[in-house]
């Protein structure tokens, strides 16, 4: 009787358990605990051979090693209309497994007012990328006076449920203005006409926008142009509301000219890094903050075996780190220690390890953990 009752109960629970498993496995977003390293995307200079996407990695957010011996990992001639790209910005999508990158389609030797396009790239492995060129003058009517298209970036807009691309444009006789448009579903083109995202109260130029979302607020870091050049911040709770609160002070911690702000959160910490290019001095500065308002220089803690220009940093998993370092090894990476714990990603408990003499392999069995009510539905 007891066995019959157990079989009946188990049969009744099977559909519910299957549903629970589907719920678990559909959640593809990567938890912060699964990140073990950082990927730095950057370019290196103003020669056409240096205007290309490069990779570097770090396991602590402070010491970085260039991959592929600081040579490009993507061929600019293949993806761009000019033969060069600058200002790479990389974003992990909401699904946790897709990556978007946007770059300025430009060769600086052609002049700072020479480019009209950006490149949209998409990848699921950080190695293989598909790309699309968006030329503003060809894509939209009435763009005859457009002079330049600079430093695109991407962010997910939760209100629209879409990915917003924002960048600066300048027209003859006007100021540089940060515009936005939403990407299409395939991330190959823009939807609708570009609209102004942010115009400072003084109506003067601003470029190199970098948006960070923290505590329900979007923080826009941007470079002022022509009036005490530097990095300022404006905040809003809604990206397209037009309601921005500007902070009056400059955020760079140097009297030298800077550009290309990039901000990222340190894994497992309530700390953020604001980095920028001290471009007139050939330096790159890192600063640290907990509130995105007050910053301190941490240059003495930062080490790189390369010199980056404008770039961005995202956290990556162990599998992603292994994939890109296997593809583009570096001679100097022998000095980098890759964390080996945890050995299983996700929440696990009660592990047991067995060795099979038949297969000559070790097997680890664990119960799942981390579910509401101390629940676990599979092992």
Residue map of PLM features:
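Bacterial Sec-dependent N-terminal signal peptides
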Residues: 1-26
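Carbohydrate-active catalytic/glycan-binding domains of CAZyme proteins
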Residues: 21-379
């Amino acid at each position: 009787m007891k066995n019959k009752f157990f079989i009946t109960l188990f049969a009744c629970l099977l559909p519910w358990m299957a549903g629970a498993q589907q719920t678990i496995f559909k959640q593809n977003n990567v938890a912060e605990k699964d990140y073990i390293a950082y990927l730095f995307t950057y370019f290196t200079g103003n020669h056409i051979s240096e205007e290309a996407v490069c990779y570097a990695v770090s396991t602590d957010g402070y010491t970085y090693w260039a991959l592929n011996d600081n040579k490009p990992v993507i061929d600019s001639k293949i993806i761009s209309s000019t033969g060069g790209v600058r200002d790479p910005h990389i974003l992990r999508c909401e699904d946790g497994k897709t990556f978007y990158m946007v770059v300025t389609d430009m060769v600086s030797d052609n002049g700072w007012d020479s480019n009209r396009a950006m490149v949209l790239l998409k990848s699921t492995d950080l190695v293989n990328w598909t790309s699309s060129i968006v030329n503003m003058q060809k894509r939209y009517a009435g763009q005859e006076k457009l002079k330049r298209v600079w430093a695109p970036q991407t962010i997910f807009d939760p209100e629209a449920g879409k990915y917003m691309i924002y960048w600066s444009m300048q027209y003859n006789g006007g100021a540089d203005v940060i515009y936005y448009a939403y990407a299409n579903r395939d991330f190959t083109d823009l939807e609708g006409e570009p609209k102004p995202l942010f115009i400072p109260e003084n109506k003067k130029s601003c470029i190199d926008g970098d948006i960070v979302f923290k505590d329900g607020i979007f923080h826009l870091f941007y470079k002022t142009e022509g009036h005490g050049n530097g990095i300022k911040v404006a905040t809003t709770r809604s990206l397209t509301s037009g309601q921005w609160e500007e902070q009056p002070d400059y955020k760079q911690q140097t009297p030298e000219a800077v550009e290309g702000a990039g901000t990222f959160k340190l894994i497992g910490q309530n700390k953020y890094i604001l980095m920028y290019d001290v471009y007139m001095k050939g330096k790159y500065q890192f600063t640290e903050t907990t509130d995105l308002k007050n910053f301190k220089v941490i240059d003495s803690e930062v080490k790189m075996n390369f010199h980056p220009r404008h770039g961005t940093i995202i956290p990556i998993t162990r599998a992603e780190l292994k994939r890109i370092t296997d593809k583009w090894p570096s001679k100097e990476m022998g000095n980098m220690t890759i964390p080996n714990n945890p050995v299983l990603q996700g929440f696990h408990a009660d592990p047991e390890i067995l060795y099979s003499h038949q297969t000559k392999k070790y097997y680890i069995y664990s119960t799942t953990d981390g579910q509401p009510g101390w629940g676990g539905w599979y092992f």
